[in-house]
From Swiss-Prot:
The modification N6-(pyridoxal phosphate)lysine is found at K265. Gene3D superfamilies: Aspartate Aminotransferase, domain 1, Type I PLP-dependent aspartate aminotransferase-like (Major domain). The keyword Transcription does not apply. Homodimer. It comes from Pseudomonas syringae pv. tomato (strain ATCC BAA-871 / DC3000). This is Glutamate-1-semialdehyde 2,1-aminomutase. SUPFAM superfamilies: PLP-dependent transferases. CDD domains: OAT_like. It catalyses: (S)-4-amino-5-oxopentanoate = 5-aminolevulinate. It is found in: Cytoplasm. Its main location: cytoplasm. Pathway: Porphyrin-containing compound metabolism; protoporphyrin-IX biosynthesis; 5-aminolevulinate from L-glutamyl-tRNA(Glu): step 2/2. It comes from the Bacteria. Its cofactor is pyridoxal 5'-phosphate.
């Protein structure tokens, strides 16, 4: 029995399902989830001392790779001064200033402790600002596990086949209107019918929780125009794409300014953190300036600020995101070549340093329906074959993959060698 098997059995005694987030349970791919004990650079090491090239990156935050020495030094330094104050710190202001400098649409920022908290708060703010109740989200897009957003959600909810989680009152769900991602006409038709009731549209500019689906040309620009036409607040959920697709996020890459944005993952450098922000006119409605209440005991935690500030400064160097995107491109080209050589139907998608893998004969991946053409059973076999070859992919056919600046030629070769063997075994 492996160490991971023993630990997983023990974990299930007091932790529901043995994990603290559903996708970690390997329910989609089968087998025993790996328990990790160490991570450095592009690698993670499990409890049985096997090392893997990591394309999960803690689900996105580890853009520098694991255990970057500068980030560790920043955290160690802050440890000497305390873990949490529950009071303002200079680092909170530094973080707000830096986020507003890097992201085109940000004029004011509120720090929180998670991406879910950020999206939940942004939606409450949009409702308070507009005086409207309804929101529009997109099929397969995941914005955290708050009640109003667990309607036709992606991520773990998609993996588990739960379109609307039990425990969400119908009275909550009725205000959440869902339309297909990348279908601008569906949004246009819905707003023509109920636009006066809609407070906001929330969208992942790159849908990263039904694998990785970039926006169709003109789609985000079309959403911006429709929101302007109907007086609807446009929210970009950049918890995943922020500072990864480009330094200024997907909104900078696609040149579209939302009214509000949410961030997480990278801004904490691996620590639990999130933020939301945007137009001063809207953000001034948040307490204590305005009547929309939002608060958090650990918001702006100094350890998270130290790790996040260091991370953002390091990724701000010229050429960083070009290098990250180039590695991702070479990875996907190499995988595609090897799949083609093996006669395996296979499609990839990319947005900067994030990517999607699909065992599908679709000509392109644009919609939720395209995503669902992917052969989940074949991905399951591929996942375990890659694990055997020393490569750790996201344990679900519906999750995006992530690269880091620590991935280089050696990791690329190891990955492609493992993939060549895996594709051959899938014939």
């Amino acid at each position: 029995m492996s160490r991971s098997e023993t630990l997983f059995a023990n974990a299930q005694k007091h932790i529901p399902g043995g994990v603290n987030s559903p996708v970690r349970a390997f329910k989609s791919v089968g087998g025993t989830p790996l328990f990790f004990k160490h991570a450095a650079g592009a690698y993670v090491t499990d409890e049985d001392d096997k090392r893997y090239v990591d394309y999960v990156g803690s689900w996105g935050p580890m853009i520098l790779g694991h255990s970057h020495p500068d980030v560790l030094d920043a955290v160690r330094n802050q440890l000497e001064h305390g873990l949490s104050y529950g009071a303002p710190t200079a680092m909170e202001t530094e973080m707000a200033d830096l986020v507003c400098e890097l992201v085109p649409s940000m004029e004011m920022v509120r720090m929180v402790s998670s991406g879910t908290e950020a999206t939940m708060s942004a939606i409450r703010l949009a409702r308070g600002f507009t005086g409207r109740d309804s929101i529009i989200k997109f099929e397969g897009c995941y914005h955290g596990h708050s009640d109003s957003l667990l309607v036709k959600a992606g991520s773990g909810a998609l993996t588990l086949g739960v379109p609307s989680s039990p425990g969400v009152p119908a009275a909550f769900a009725k205000h959440t209107l869902t339309v297909p991602f990348n279908d601008l006409n569906a949004v246009r038709d819905l707003l023509a019918e109920v636009g006066q009731e809609v407070a906001c549209i929330i969208v992942e500019p790159v849908a990263g929780n039904m694998n990785c689906v970039p926006p169709a040309p003109g789609y985000l620009q079309g959403l911006r125009a429709l929101c302007d036409e109907h007086g609807v607040v446009l929210i970009f959920d950049e918890v995943m794409t922020g500072f990864r697709v480009a330094l200024g996020g997907a909104q900078a890459y696609y040149d579209v300014k939302p009214d509000l944005s949410t961030f997480g993952k990278i801004i904490g450098g691996g620590m639990p953190v999130g933020c939301f922000g945007g137009k001063r006119e809207i953000m001034s409605h948040i307490a204590p300036l305005g009547p929309v209440y939002q608060a958090g005991t650990l918001s702006g935690n100094p350890l998270a600020m130290a790790a996040g500030l260091t991370t953002l400064r390091l990724i701000s160097r010229p050429g960083f995101h070009d290098e990250l995107s180039d590695y991702t491109r070479r990875l996907l080209e190499g995988l595609q070549q090897r799949a083609d050589a093996a006669g395996i139907a296979f499609v990839t998608t990319q947005a900067g340093g994030m990517f999607g893998l699909y065992f599908s004969d679709a000509s392109e991946i644009v919609t939720f329906e395209d995503v669902m053409t992917s052969d989940a059973e074949r991905f399951k076999r591929f996942f375990h074959l890659m694990l055997e070859g020393g490569v750790y992919l996201a344990p679900s056919a519906f999750e995006a993959g992530f690269t880091s600046i620590a991935h280089g030629d050696a990791e690329l070769k190891l990955t492609l060698d493992a993939a060549e063997k895996a594709f051959a075994a899938l014939k």
